[in-house]
Amino acid sequence: VLSPADKTNVKTAWNAVGGQAGEHGAEALERMFLSFPTTKTYFPHFDLSHGSGQVKAHGKKVADALTNAVSHLDDMPGALSALSDLHAHKLRVDPVNFKLLSHCLLVTLASHHPAEFTPAVHASLDKFFAAVSTVLTSKYR
């Protein structure tokens, strides 16, 4: 559960990302594919090379979903319901992959925004990504 301080930290950190969210999403996906090669199996139709238009487009989708979640911190299950259905029923993504992407997102954000990435912000973003992952895997049961 995100505390009021966590919510403030998440909103502040995401605002710092600003118009770079799509680029950061794509970079996090690239990190995930390189660090955890088994995640590539969910994207057999993608060109997974560095700078790929398909990875950039999917990175923007990831970033847009996270922006939506940040805008609905008090109702993430409602805001992400359709995305949860998609990943659980159609795409059948193994839930562990959300943790892997969350880690790669944290690394990407820390590398681009070191001044804003304090220990408190790191902890709040980690809790936020865990909450998003929980929502996205809630329809698996």
Swiss-Prot record:
Red blood cells. GO terms for molecular function: haptoglobin binding; heme binding; iron ion binding; organic acid binding; oxygen binding; oxygen carrier activity; peroxidase activity. Residues 1-141 form the Globin domain. The modification N6-succinyllysine is found at residues 7, 11, 40. GO terms for cellular component: blood microparticle; haptoglobin-hemoglobin complex; hemoglobin complex. PROSITE patterns: GLOBIN. InterPro entries: Globin (IPR000971), Globin-like_sf (IPR009050), Globin/Proto (IPR012292), Hemoglobin_a-typ (IPR002338), Hemoglobin_oxygen_transport (IPR050056), Hemoglobin_pi (IPR002339). Disulfide bonds: none annotated. Involved in oxygen transport from the lung to the various peripheral tissues. This is Hemoglobin subunit alpha. The gene is HBA.
